[in-house]
Amino acid sequence: MAQLYYKKVNYSPYRDRIPLQIVRAETELSAEEKAFLNAVEKGDYATVKQALQEAEIYYNVNINCMDPLGRSALLIAIENENLEIMELLLNHSVYVGDALLYAIRKEVVGAVELLLSYRRPSGEKQVPTLMMDTQFSEFTPDITPIMLAAHTNNYEIIKLLVQKRVTIPRPHQIRCNCVECVSSSEVDSLRHSRSRLNIYKALASPSLIALSSEDPILTAFRLGWELKELSKVENEFKAEYEELSQQCKLFAKDLLDQARSSRELEIILNHRDDHSEELDPQKYHDLAKLKVAIKYHQKEFVAQPNCQQLLATLWYDGFPGWRRKHWVVKLLTCMTIGFLFPMLSIAYLISPRSNLGLFIKKPFIKFICHTASYLTFLFMLLLASQHIVRTDLHVQGPPPTVVEWMILPWVLGFIWGEIKEMWDGGFTEYIHDWWNLMDFAMNSLYLATISLKIVAYVKYNGSRPREEWEMWHPTLIAEALFAISNILSSLRLISLFTANSHLGPLQISLGRMLLDILKFLFIYCLVLLAFANGLNQLYFYYETRAIDEPNNCKGIRCEKQNNAFSTLFETLQSLFWSVFGLLNLYVTNVKARHEFTEFVGATMFGTYNVISLVVLLNMLIAMMNNSYQLIADHADIEWKFARTKLWMSYFDEGGTLPPPFNIIPSPKSFLYLGNWFNNTFCPKRDPDGRRRRHNLRSFTERHADSLIQNQHYQEVIRNLVKRYVAAMIRNSKTNEGLTEENFKELKQDISSFRYEVLDLLGNRKHQRRSFSTSSTELSQRDDTNDGSGGARAKSKSVSFNVGCKKKACHGPPLIRTMPRVGGAQGKSKAESSSKRSFMGPSLKKLGLLFSKFNGHMSEPSSEPMYTISDGIVQPHYMWQDIRYSQMEKGKAEACSQSEINLSEVELGEARGTAQSTECPLACSSSLHCVSSICSSNSKLLDSSEDVFETWGEACDLLMHKWGDGQEEQVTTRL
């Protein structure tokens, strides 16, 4: 295996060594290109500009070169948020490429604005572009700027792009079989799936939904549901789609959190998206948006405290302060209303709009009346099961008893209620509720019981001993079905536990456990069928007759079990009951002396018990425990969602009367029926068009009301979005904290500012500007200079020619401060430390100057500041590097006597204005001197410890003022 990595050599010293070499070598940068990228990294505007100008003339630098990290100069400027250098590079037509995507990923808003407004000038000579191969790009071809901005969820960048009217590809349906989807999947299935995931990841961005959707809440509902369904199809990316679905749910919930009044909450929850339903005046204030949330399983939205507060107010309408009452008072009130439900129902039948009729229509009263009616039905079932009315047990077709006659109206009322619910909500919505399926099964069993009793009453007359009845006698089947329906009717009462905060989570956990049991039964049935087939195959030949067994009994129900595996059905029963320990081991014996057969049978029976009891049963317990823990972790949300579904069933119009009063036609029902019959079969002529004009007027009024309601909804949504965005930005700044990136940005700002100040003070006037190829060489050169006591070591450097030579410079501030700190190299450490003690006030002034440049502070007083260079370079090294000892004494004194005000120092003056006194001439090794200056400056910048200890106060003041400005900027934009 080692031969794959190195070539075997014969000489011993390197026999146990693996020679390493770069296999995939990249093109090395030239020294000029390294210096160019280094200047961009440091923020040296003048050097970058000079390098770009020389590149246009001499072509000595490839301005599109990349560093080992694959970053071009433009990308480095974007990463450092240096907009001035970015603009300079764009003016020289550098290759843009994925710079916009890179700026969006780095969330540099200024760079995005600059790149969006950038247009390549036509007719000019352009530098050949690189990186044209998309294989080396950091972004896949399907990623667009708006998609990447949506992935980062940067509100400001998304707003900039949306204002440019960008678009996002519309994803096809989940199970779309169009030509485009099929061909894309066949060509590259991975790219097709990834592209779909990237599109949905962009569409699920809260900022994008808030900006581009007219109804962001409904959009979040539908998108969350679609992503949940897509996670079931794209199993490979199931976790990603589920995370996006949860993100949409949380966005809708967070948006509802911003509601500040009951009016805003009502406008949101009562808004309809279906215009045909909006024109119906009777359907206002029916919580349409909340119904949509329940339909799409938006549990977080439904369980939101604001939503629950409004629902509780509507639920306890007419009972102010209900929750503050004692539980005894609540119990007595509920029992009183429950006992009075027949009278309240009769009052509603007679006069629906009376006080009692309106009282029973309240949701809480309706719930109590329906519960009392169902408890009465269960009480009658209990009376029927106890046979309080004695009848002849041997009558084959017994007539109905008094209790059964009393049960019949309730059964008919239940059936009529289910028919109305299916008619109002639709068949699809009806079958999605498991309790409706249970009601359907229960009502079907009651109908089958009634039908079989009628058949037995008509067909069979007289009495006969029950022991002599045939097995499929109608009365026997009816009794069995009635017993099963009694069980289902009693269990149906569990649905009412949802209204209680203590029993509700238990009821939800029970429902989840039933799902686990169904999953478990699939595996268990497979194991059961496998062992049943094998045991039946083994013991089929040893079946005996009933007359050969004791008491003429055959099967496992006998006192002495036998023939447990003689048939397949008997084998299935035997294995099932063996799980509960109801089968003995001797059933594996045979009358013949076939010990091998008995051993194989006993081994198979034991293996089945180990698998079913030890493995499968414990797996079922673990699954049920997991389901319960999942509900317990989200007990509050799950219970509130289930309770809301229960409450919403009583908020709707209709279904006011409980069984059996709901089967009695009311006067209102006769009125509705008469109007329908009159309009359908006896249409009246309208020669004058009065009815048509009346319908047009009413339609216009309803449409106007709909527009007003929609306008109010849009105003509320606009306010919610503003509050949400403000809270999102505020939370992101709070959670961001102080990171390493902040220190890097601060260091970059200080470096750029240093070069700007050097240009302003006129210290960068030499003919040649030298740069080392790496920061390591710079630091090594500084160490060499310090140790040699002024001796200059020759090192390789790269120079950019400066076009203009100036004979005068703005140097007096620097020269006035230099003698003060000492120009000799022989100073002691104590003296040097004392000389640095006065640097604090200078740094404070430097911070004020920096704030002034950034526009966050008012301009300070324009009094002269002569110690600005103390915070820029260390005076000792500057003095040592420049070697002013070689200068003429008269010229130095003349320069030291000149004064200049810092507020008057500008870049144009530094480059174009000449002073009356000439600056000192450069030494013979001026190129090397300037390189040493850069070494000192680089050493200062690379030492983060010195920077943050010395410039602490100014940086703190700078960051404080910058933070205040950012908050004001965010508030202004919002």
Curated annotation (Swiss-Prot):
GO biological process, one term: neuron apoptotic process
Transmembrane segments: 364-384, 405-419, 434-454, 477-497, 513-535, 604-624
Membrane topology: Multi-pass membrane protein
S-S bridge residues: 553-558
Predominant localisation class: membrane
Gene3D superfamilies linked: Ankyrin repeat-containing domain (1.25.40.20)
Coiled coil stretches, renumbered: none
Gene Ontology CC terms: plasma membrane
Any one Gene Ontology molecular-function term assigned to this protein's record: calcium channel activity
Superkingdom in the source lineage: Eukaryota
Topological domains annotated Extracellular: 385-404, 455-476, 536-603
Positions annotated as ANK repeat: 30-60, 69-97, 98-124, 141-170
Residues bound to Ca(2+): 418, 421, 436, 439
Record topology, Cytoplasmic segments: 1-325, 361-363, 420-433, 498-512, 625-974
Activity regulation description: Activated by G-protein coupled receptors via direct interaction with GTP-bound GNAI3, which increases the channel sensitivity to phosphatidylinositol bisphosphate. May be activated by intracellular calcium store depletion. Calcium channel activity is enhanced by MYLK, that promotes its subcellular localization at the plasma membrane.
Keyword entries, A-Z: ANK repeat, Calcium, Calcium channel, Calcium transport, Cell membrane, Disulfide bond, Ion channel, Ion transport, Membrane, Metal-binding, Repeat, Transmembrane, Transmembrane helix, Transport, Zinc
InterPro entries (alphabetical): Ion_trans_dom, TRPC_channel
Catalytic activity entry: Ca(2+)(in) = Ca(2+)(out)
Localisation per UniProt entry: Cell membrane
Intramembrane segments: 326-360
SUPFAM superfamilies with a match to the protein in the record: Ankyrin repeat
Residues the record lists as binding Zn(2+): 172, 176, 178, 181
Assembly behavior: Homotetramer. Heterotetramer with TRPC1 and/or TRPC4. Each subunit in the homomeric ion channel (via ANK repeats) interacts with one copy of GTP-bound GNAI3; the interaction is direct and activates the ion channel. Interacts with TRPC4AP. Interacts with NHERF1. Interacts with MX1 and RNF24. Interacts (via C-terminus) with CABP1. Interacts with SESTD1 (via the spectrin 1 repeat). Interacts with PLSCR1. Interacts with PKD2L2.
Family as reported in the entry's similarity comment: Belongs to the transient receptor (TC 1.A.4) family. STrpC subfamily. TRPC5 sub-subfamily.
Main function: Forms a receptor-activated non-selective calcium permeant cation channel. Mediates calcium-dependent phosphatidylserine externalization and apoptosis in neurons via its association with PLSCR1. Acts on distinct neuronal populations in the hypothalamus to regulate innate behaviors including feeding, anxiety (flight/fight/fear), socialization and maternal care.
Protein name: Short transient receptor potential channel 5
Source taxonomy: Eukaryota, Metazoa, Chordata, Craniata, Vertebrata
